[in-house]
Amino acid sequence: GDEALFLLQGSEAQMQAALARTPELIEPGLTVLNRELLVGVGGIDLYARDSQGRFVVVELKRGKAGHEAVHQLARYVQAVREQVPGPVRGVLAAPDITVPALKVAQASGLEYVKVEALPQVPEEALQPTLF
């Protein structure tokens, strides 16, 4: 029912929050610009800039990433490319990816980074301190 859906969204949101705070888990030198930058194709999970100043669009998946995630990321990257000057990278961050999806990603110039579904981030980094 709805409960399972809520839990799923909750942990995807937790993963997003954790990676927004510690983007170096995806790649050293990554700076998160805006967690939810809308570009007319739905919400981008993480929008960042790499150490060389290139824009990076990050698509997060809690489970094994498949074709759907790769196509979604490709659409986001295309949409961002139309709006910003300079190169735009697309990174799919997930615990695992199917072999066909990885081949499609690589053929499309997208990158896959293995990230645990719930990265090990100190608890206090995830929650504002309660006084």
Descriptions of predicted regions:
Residues G1-F131:
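Charged, terminal alpha-helix-loop-beta segments
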